[in-house]
Design a protein with these regions (language model features):
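A residue-level marker of the well-folded mature domains of exported/periplasmic proteins
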Residues: 22-341
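Sec-dependent N-terminal signal peptides of Gram-positive bacterial secreted proteins and lipoproteins
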Residues: 3-22
Length: 341
C-alpha cells in the first residue's frame, strides 16, 4: 500500500507540472500574408507548436490590404477568440479600437508595435541593441575602414535608434569612423537602395548598414554587380536571416525573434500573467540578436566573418545581454551629433 500511495503522489506531482490543456480556448493571429516571410512564419510555427502544449484552437487571418485588416479584427471579435494577436505595425490601430469596445474576456496583443492602449499588450524591441551589435561587427570585420554607409527607409525619430546604435557600435571599435545616410522613402522599392549603394561605394564605403526593410534587396543586388567590377561592398539584412549562398556580400542580419515573442505572449496568457501596456524586449530576452552571433545562419562568408570576428561579436552580445554593457540612447536626435561625411 505504501508503494502504491507513493506512486500516486508522484503521479499527481507530475500532472501538476504539465501545463493545463486549454479546452475551448481560441487564438487568432492577424498579419500580412505569411508566404515565406520568416518574420511571420516564426509566429505561425510557434502558435502551431504551443497548440500541442496548451490544446487551444487557432486561426491565422492573413491581410493583403487595409480592408482585410479591419474585417479580420471584426471577425475575430465576433467569433469570440480568447486571444487576438496582431503582428506588425498595421495591427496597432485595429487592436486599440477593438479593445476599447470588445468584452473584457477577449485579450489583445500586438508584436513589433505599440498600440498605445491600456487594453492591449504591446510588444516592441530595443532595436538599438541589435544595431549596436551590427556596428561593432562592421568595425571588427573592417578595422581599417573609417567610412561607413547606412541606407534606411525613412529619416526621423523612428529610425534614430537604428542609426544611433549602429554608429555607436562602429565607434566602439573604430573611434574615428564617419557615416553617410540615404533613405529610400519606401519599405518595399529596391530601386533607390540599389542606386544609393552604388553612390555610397563611390564615396568610399565598403560596409553599408541595410536598414531599409524589403528595399535592402537593392543593396544586395548592387553588391553582386559591384563585385564583378572588383568593387566589393558588404551589408546585412533586417528582422530575419537574409544570408544566402548565392550572395556572400550579405554578412549577417539584425534579428527580431518574433517566434520567441509569440511564445512569451502565449505562455503569459495561459499563466494568467499577460499584462496590458508596452513591453520592450531585449537581447537578454532572446528577442534581439544577429545571424552567426546569437543565432545560426543560412550561409557564412568565413573570409570576412572569421572565427575571431564572430568571437569578438559574441562577447559584445553577451555584454549587452548580461547588462555589463548598457546602451543609454539620447532622448532625441537633437542631443546627438553624427560624424557625417
Amino acid at each position: 500500500m505504501k508503494k502504491i500511495a507513493s506512486l500516486l503522489i508522484v503521479f499527481v506531482l507530475v500532472l501538476a507540472m504539465v501545463p493545463a490543456m486549454a479546452e475551448g480556448e481560441k487564438i487568432a493571429v492577424i498579419c500580412d500574408p505569411v508566404g515565406v516571410n520568416a518574420f511571420l512564419t516564426q509566429v505561425v510555427e510557434k502558435v502551431e507548436d504551443l497548440a500541442g502544449t496548451y490544446g487551444y484552437e487557432y486561426r491565422i487571418l492573413e491581410c493583403p490590404d487595409t480592408d482585410k485588416w479591419q474585417a479580420s479584427y471584426d471577425a475575430a471579435v465576433a467569433e469570440e477568440y480568447d486571444l487576438i494577436l496582431g503582428v506588425g505595425w498595421q495591427s496597432a490601430e485595429y487592436a486599440a479600437a477593438k479593445a476599447a469596445e470588445a468584452d473584457d474576456s477577449i485579450r489583445f496583443a500586438v508584436i513589433d508595435t505599440d498600440a498605445g492602449s491600456d487594453g492591449v499588450a504591446s510588444y516592441s524591441y530595443n532595436e538599438e541593441q541589435g544595431a549596436y551589435l551590427m556596428g561593432a561587427m562592421a568595425g571588427y570585420a573592417f578595422p581599417n575602414e573609417t567610412k561607413f554607409g547606412y541606407i534606411g527607409c525613412f529619416e526621423g525619430s523612428g529610425s534614430f535608434k537604428y542609426r544611433w546604435g549602429f554608429m555607436e557600435g562602429v565607434k566602439s571599435v573604430v573611434p574615428d569612423a564617419q557615416i553617410t545616410f540615404n533613405y529610400t522613402n519606401s519599405y518595399s522599392d529596391p530601386a533607390p537602395a540599389y542606386d544609393f549603394a552604388k553612390q555610397q561605394q563611390a564615396k568610399g564605403c565598403t560596409y553599408i548598414f541595410g536598414g531599409a526593410a524589403a528595399c535592402n534587396e537593392g543593396i544586395f543586388n548592387a553588391a553582386l554587380e559591384l563585385a564583378e567590377e572588383g568593387k566589393n561592398i558588404y551589408s546585412i539584412g533586417q528582422d530575419t536571416d537574409m544570408t544566402r549562398e548565392d550572395n556572400p556580400y550579405v554578412l549577417s542580419s539584425q534579428l527580431k525573434e518574433t517566434g520567441v515573442t509569440a511564445g512569451i505572449i502565449i505562455d503569459a496568457f495561459f499563466a494568467g500573467t499577460l499584462e496590458n501596456g508596452l513591453h520592450v524586449l531585449e537581447m537578454k530576452d532572446g528577442a534581439i540578436g544577429a545571424t552567426h552571433i546569437t543565432a545560426e545562419g543560412n550561409s557564412l562568408n568565413s573570409e570576412i566573418m572569421t572565427d575571431e570576428v564572430i568571437a569578438q561579436c559574441k562577447a559584445v552580445a553577451d555584454a549587452i545581454a548580461s547588462g555589463e554593457l548598457v546602451l543609454e540612447m539620447p532622448a532625441s536626435e537633437d542631443d546627438y551629433t553624427f560624424p557625417i561625411f
